[in-house]
Amino acid sequence: MPLSKNVIEKISIETIRVLKSRFDTISDEDIKIRNMPFHMAFLRAFYGKIGINDDTEALKFLTLSQWFHGLSTTLGQSYFENIAHILSNGEKRTFKNYKIKRSVRDKISEIINDLKSGERLPNVEKENKELREATSKNSEYVNGLEFTADVYFEDKDKVVMIELKTVRPNAGEMRGEKQKILYGKAYMMETKPNKKVYYFIGFPYDPTENPENPCGYDKDRFMSSLIEFSKYFDKREVLIAEELWSFLSGEENTMKKILDIINSIAKPDFKEKFDFINTFPFINQDRLYTKDAIDEQKFKKYMDILQEWRLYSEIECAKAVKELSLLKLSSRDRRTFERLINNSMFSNNNKYNENRKMKILELYNKYMQK
């Protein structure tokens, strides 16, 4: 079953937002070749290793690396998380100032210490059983460890939480991540005792996979590439690459579909197309409400871009604008319509202007019902 048009459009909008924000943060000054003598001095030792031929290529490499770092930060801090929420109908949720039983806290400390010392191997089923038993004991309550689930969603019979990580997490942070996950599961087990509780750690792609197979993954290989990861985590509590994205959506091949959406938008002419569709360029505003209100050639170009970028509801909005531009509107509705068509699809801070679309469609439906 394919992703719904609504989900696809939301992914497209999020992709456009990220691309536009990256264009906004890279000035002509940022892409100039800069003087970096110390970086260059060290980098020359690696020319053969990374396939750089000369200093000119090296300076371009350093400049691109700085920009790429910013893109990686944007993807890790917002894009992956927002796409996960779109696919799962979930949200980010923080838990603090809560209480757990002392017996639970002691059990978590025991599990963590045993994993650290190597006295036990990670086993998610055994750990869950021990946590359930600890929550059922008669024990005083103590403060729990604050935690945030990057993705949280809840069904009738289960609670699912996911910690989204970069594919190269910092060495030494695995112990803390495991501890946080155990606290999160224990708290949910006590507050929602009749529901199954899952807390995964998720990675958006597998960097150890062959680039010719971007959606593929080898969980064992990936886990072994991270310092102390297998020491604390059972592979059953890890979601990676296609496995993660399809789990979130409930549909197969979701990662490929996400990449297809990105690839349809992220092209060299992105900025040119964005600037064209961000307003309604096909309207001849000095000829509104006449047969010459629409520039048909520009309208076709506008619609082609919306179709290519999978902005399905904006296609309906554009059709409504075309119809309304030819109608005899009341003076009050004219004022509303004229203000709406001078709004942008994306604001200066790159926020999608859904209100513009909704108000235009509302006005259109009002006249179509007459």
From Swiss-Prot:
Organism listed in the record: Methanocaldococcus jannaschii (strain ATCC 43067 / DSM 2661 / JAL-1 / JCM 10045 / NBRC 100440)
Encoding gene per record: mjaIIR
Enzyme class: hydrolase
EC number: 3.1.21.4
Keywords: DNA-binding, Endonuclease, Hydrolase, Nuclease, Restriction system
Catalytic function, reaction form: Endonucleolytic cleavage of DNA to give specific double-stranded fragments with terminal 5'-phosphates
Name by which UniProt lists this protein: Type II restriction enzyme MjaII
Keyword DNA-binding: yes
Keyword Nuclease part of the UniProt annotation: yes
Any one GO MF annotation of this record: type II site-specific deoxyribonuclease activity
Gene Ontology BP terms: DNA restriction-modification system
